[in-house]
Amino acid sequence: TYTHLLRTSHEFDSTLNNNPAIALSFRNQFIPSMSYSYTFDRAATYRNPNRLFWQTSLTQAGNIISGIEYLAGKKGSGKKIFGNVYSQFLKLTSEVIKYKQVSDNSLVATRFMGGIGYAYGNTKVMPYSEQFYIGGANSIRAFRIRSIGPGSYRPQTKSVTAYLDQTGDIKLETDIGYRFKIAGRMYGALFMDAGNVWLVRKEKERPGGEFRLKGLWKEIALGTGFGLRYDITYIVIRADLGVALHAPYDTGKAGYFNIRNYGFKDGLVLNLAIGYPF
């Protein structure tokens, strides 16, 4: 993969200037990556209606080229290929999903997913396209996509490019939902989502973003909500109303349930999507 920015805005450039790590992740670079995946899928049967799905993937980039250059006597970082710096990193992701049948018309779906990426050798920052983010219709539905993290960090500005630096090298997320039939093709769901992303290395531009075990529970965003699904055989039209319970950053309100005001500007998120979140 080759990444190259053709055109940028003033706001975008300003964000990169204020955050060197993000700027490095967006620079023109060659990503010589290979991925290896393992998938286990125990499909539901008449005797065992509970499905279990597990997928783990390992992605590595730049190691073969780096090894060849090392044997050729080229050492250090910032080495180039085709005129551009090449990325070097390892990235591990894993996702486990279980569906437990409760009755003929209802089930409980649970998901746990995690991942970690580490850049080293030729580069010190993961490419932006390989970094983790959280929130949105298929993640923590009570928070908009890329609106939380890393850690307890919160951008000081509310510009249109503020979401750019809300990514991380580590991701933890868990989701649980009770899905049931209402009538005909209409289905309902009650759900709860939790998780966040973090940085491997400490950055002064994103204070509180690094992963720490101490106080980790405070940095886990938590949301709940309910939704409707309309099944038209080939696709499922979904609407989920997410209700935030705990934000991982300082909201100015004391206590664990620290959402100050509930409204569609803060605290409530309506997600419209096609298909199930997992």
Over which residues does each language-model region extend?
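Strand-connecting loop/turn motifs
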Residues: 49-51, 103-107, 183-185, 232-236, ...
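C-terminal substrate/ligand-recognition segments
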Residues: 175-184, 228-230
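C-terminal outer-membrane beta-barrel translocator/porin domains of Gram-negative envelope proteins
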Residues: 1-180, 190-213
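Long, low-complexity, intrinsically disordered polar/charged segments
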Residues: 185-193, 273-278
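Outer-membrane beta-barrel "beta-signal"
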Residues: 230-234, 264-278
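C-terminal beta-signal and adjacent terminal beta-strands/loops
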Residues: 194-210, 234, 241-260, 276-278
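A short, conserved beta-to-alpha structural element at the edge of catalytic cores
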Residues: 217-238
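Short beta-alpha connecting loops at secondary-structure transitions
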Residues: 19, 77-80, 128-129, 208-213, ...
